[in-house]
Every structure is written in C-alpha cells, then in structure tokens.
From Swiss-Prot:
GO molecular function, one term: 5-dehydro-4-deoxyglucarate dehydratase activity
Name the UniProt record assigns to this protein: Probable 5-dehydro-4-deoxyglucarate dehydratase
SMART domains reported for this sequence: DHDPS
GO biological process, one term: D-glucarate catabolic process
Pathway(s) it belongs to: Carbohydrate acid metabolism; D-glucarate degradation; 2,5-dioxopentanoate from D-glucarate: step 2/2
EC number(s) stated in the UniProt entry for this protein: 4.2.1.41
Organism field: Leptothrix cholodnii (strain ATCC 51168 / LMG 8142 / SP-6) (Leptothrix discophora (strain SP-6))
Superkingdom, natural source: Bacteria
Amino acid sequence: MSPQELKNVLQSGLLSFPLTDFDRELNFAPKPYAERLKWLQPYGASALFAAGGTGEFFSLEPGEYSDVIKVALDTCRGRTPIIAGAGGGTRVAIQYAQEAERLGAQGVLLLPHYLTEASQEGLIAHVQAVCRSVRFGVTVYNRGACKLTPASLLVLAETCPNLIGFKDGIGDIETFVSIRQTLGERFAYLGGLPTAEVFAGAYKAMGCPVYSSAVFNFIPKTAMEFYNAHAAGDSATCDRLIRDFFLPYIALRNKNHGYAVSIVKAGATLIGHGAGPVRPPLSDLKPAEVAELAALMAKLGPQ
C-alpha cells in the first residue's frame, strides 16, 4: 500500500487499536490475539493500529513486537489494513518502523518519544529520520512530549513525502485549527484524545471527521453505532450515547492513572473476549470498578 493509498484509508471510517493479549504470566498470547482480531473484523473498522498505545506498545519487547505485528497481518491480510505502532528514541523508533515494513504492515503510527522534552528542531529531526528510514506511510501522533507546531509540520510536509497523517492527542483547539488551516489537505487528520467519541463532534467541526476508538475493543456494535451517527450528523444519537455511556465511562476511567488501557481490558473480559491483565506499571481495575463498568455496559445491550 502506497503512502497516498494509506492516507485515503485514514480519511474515512472508524479506526481502532486492538488490545494485546497476555496470559497469566504476562507473556504475549498469540492465539487469543488472533481470535480477538477475527471477532472484531465483521464490525468494519477501516484500519487497525496494532501494538499501539492501547495495545501496550510501551511494554513490549522487540521480539514480542514482531510477533504481535505478524499475527495481526496474518489474521487481517486482505481485509483490514494494519498500521503498526513505533516509538521511543529515534534509533529505536527506526528499528520498529523498519521491522513493521519488513513484516508487511501498511504503515506506521509514530508514537511520542520517551521521557525527555525536546525542541522543535529536535522533533523535526526525529520525525524526518523515521520517515526517511522507510518507504511506507507514516502518521505522527502529537501527544505527550511530542508537540509539533504548525510551522514544524510545514517543514515535515515539505521534506517527508511519506508523512501522510497527523493524529492529535493534545486537544488544544487553537493549535489544531492552526495546523488544519496551515497544512490543508496535505495530511489525513485523526482525533486521538482518550475516549475520542466525546470530542468527535468538536473535531469534525475543525475539519477532522475521523478518530480512533478504544471502546471498539469491547462494545464494537455501539462504537460503530456512534461513528455512523457521527458521520451522518445524527447529533441526537451521539448526545444520547455520550450522556448515558461515555461520560460515566470517563468518570470511571479517571479514577486512576493508566486506566485508559486498563478499563478497556476490563471491558473486553466482561464482554467475553478477555485479553488478560495489563502489564506493570499499569494496574487493573478494582472489583468494585469492574462492577460499575459492567452496569454501564449492560445498558447498551448485546454487542
């Protein structure tokens, strides 16, 4: 898939990022992971980010990363494009991106670098190095320590032809509007705030109609119902789901640091497609919190 073809894929439909399955000893569990992908396929996500943030990329060893991407590609080949996560320091991110390309992934999501703050010059050099190390399409994730400005993205757009996507996980309205107006149609724009459904309407108004859904992992029917309503301008359905499910869900998610991943794994277990525990430093939901989530999910009906 060429970078331009990947850009076209990312400009419509619901995107998601599958959980990574671990066993009780916290080892990667390839068979349940493949079964998860098979279960999700009929719901119709336009692309999946394998080994992304919700897939606990940050906890994977290099060998495990290769296994995760390979299972995703083998399971979804010919049906759902697989975009691999890549991140860390520049040389490490290059290694992940090149491995994903070698395995046959359709593109890569460049996750924020680790720990240290960086200047705009440093961020530009980092993204350029990763883009120049591969031929397939790259989407950069503006989040955490990676806060690219409109001017920096303009430089990257001119120097990295395979940089085709911009995912926003910061939520600064002024900055995003400036980026969207400065770069125009050069990128595919993705909403990437946690529990993106709550912000989908605002992002659509700013010229970003596409987002990635974490809840697709455990309430895929509802996730697609929300996306279809969002795409059709059915604000009544979107408002109902935000009010009845997503806002209480966010309140539960915010009870502890790292729960943005943990709550999704808890939901997958409740729906009958468990992905095992999260790896440290994340922690699983407490029993009472799981019960709260179960009550919320029950209101949505069968998935």
